Design a protein with these regions (language model features):
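Helix-turn-helix
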Residues: 34-66, 70
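Secondary-structure edge/capping motif, primarily at the C-terminal ends of alpha-helices
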Residues: 83-90, 116-123, 177, 181-185
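Short, basic, alpha-helical segments at the C-terminal edge of helix-turn-helix-like DNA-binding modules
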Residues: 43, 72-80
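Short, hydrophobic secondary-structure boundary micro-motifs
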Residues: 40-41, 116-119, 131-132, 160, ...
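Short secondary-structure transition hinges
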Residues: 111-143
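C-terminal peripheral helix-coil segments that are non-catalytic and often amphipathic
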Residues: 1-7, 111, 146-154, 168, ...
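Basic, helix-initiating cap at the start of DNA-binding domains
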Residues: 1-41, 45-49
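Hydrophobic alpha-helical connector segments
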Residues: 70, 84-111, 163, 167-170, ...
Length: 212
């Protein structure tokens, strides 16, 4: 069935908006990496570096916060996929396996830490941004809780844990650790951080349980 004119226009709009987001993302991430604050970055500065006009920008985005939501969407999706990948196992990992998984997560998360920090910064004053940030990590929390509950039934996760509460601690401990510790660590430091986090999670979830 052929698309209607409205559907064609909507697809064109979405494609062009995505193109603009891809163009602006490296500009914003570079400014944030240089120590800038998203709150104080001016739209005009972003547009100048991205070679975009004001009219083009405001056709696709209501304001700078709506742009932030568009920029962060793919980032949160990448973070979510990386975070849940180690939990797809149906048996307990070894500490070395868990450490390797977390090292991969660090590599996915680290380039986007400035943008994620911007999301936290703006979330204090914008309820919609705050809701988006919390929902992004709520998905990770729910996946970890599901893994714990499944592992308890299968016998490879400790039975004395509260799945939802334990998952919440792991989720938000890791989120803060990524932004406060991993962001500034060199390669050797990141290795030690991955080893340390793996030890905490492994002892919390799997110690003393069957690995099969």
């Amino acid at each position: 069935m052929p698309l209607s004119p409205d559907e064609i226009d909507a697809r064109r709009f979405a494609a062009r908006r995505h193109e603009i987001v891809e163009r602006i993302l490296p500009v914003v991430e570079q400014r944030l990496s240089d120590g800038g604050s998203y709150v104080t970055i001016k739209v005009e500065e972003i547009l100048q570096e991205a070679s975009l006009s004001r009219s083009t920008f405001y056709r696709y985005f209501k304001d700078k916060n709506e742009l932030l939501l568009a920029l962060i969407g793919p980032v949160l999706q990448d973070v979510r996929i990386a975070a849940i990948r180690p939990l797809e196992r149906t048996s307990a990992p070894t500490r070395k396996q868990l450490q390797a998984d977390l090292a991969v997560n660090f590599d996915v998360y680290r380039p986007h830490i400035p943008l994620l920090n911007a999301l936290v910064e703006v979330s204090y004053s914008d309820p919609e941004i705050r809701k988006h940030f919390q929902q992004g990590f709520a998905d990770v929390h729910q996946t970890i809780a599901g893994h714990i509950a499944y592992g308890q039934r299968a016998g490879f996760v400790r039975p004395d844990l509260h799945p939802a509460e334990t998952a919440a601690w792991i989720t938000w401990m890791a989120e803060r650790g990524m932004t406060q510790l991993v962001a500034e660590a060199d390669a050797a430091g990141r290795g030690r951080l991955a080893e340390s986090l793996a030890a905490m999670v492994w002892h919390t979830l799997y110690e003393g349980q069957s690995s099969s």
